[in-house]
Amino acid sequence: MAAPGFLPRPDFQHLLTALTAAGYLCLGPKVRDGAITYEELGSTDDLPRGVHDHQQPGAYRLHRDESPRCFSWANGPQALKPLLFAPRETLWTSAAGSDGGITFHPEIPEALPTAVIGVRACDLAALRLQDQHFLEGPSPDPHYGIRRRNLFLVAVHCT
């Protein structure tokens, strides 16, 4: 893992352009249906500026102001998990052999290289736990592994 660094705002678009040129689908925070969700980013202009959240038990509301800040909210209702686990997928197929036996063939998904902009420390901590279980355990999950290897994360500091 690379050492953390600071990316000045004028260089942020260069990062998105480089990731896109390298074949990554760039996802980042956007406002949809009153919540912050990860969606495709075309440019840094797509990032919501001046959006803040107010959370309490049973409530989640977004508010806007004139602030130029792009990441001034806590985590939204969406996490990284949907990017790593498909709701349904074929794990294997089988075929009957001429000898009457059955042959099983694993189905390994193709994963699009995906860059996620705006990941929080709590997301990284949860991802580490998933990695321990699904990559480093006694039976690594190849489906999780291929998606995880194709994931590029850009974290932001929670203040």
Regions found by a protein language model. Give the residues of each.
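Iron-sulfur-associated redox domains of electron-transfer enzymes in respiratory
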Residues: 1-159
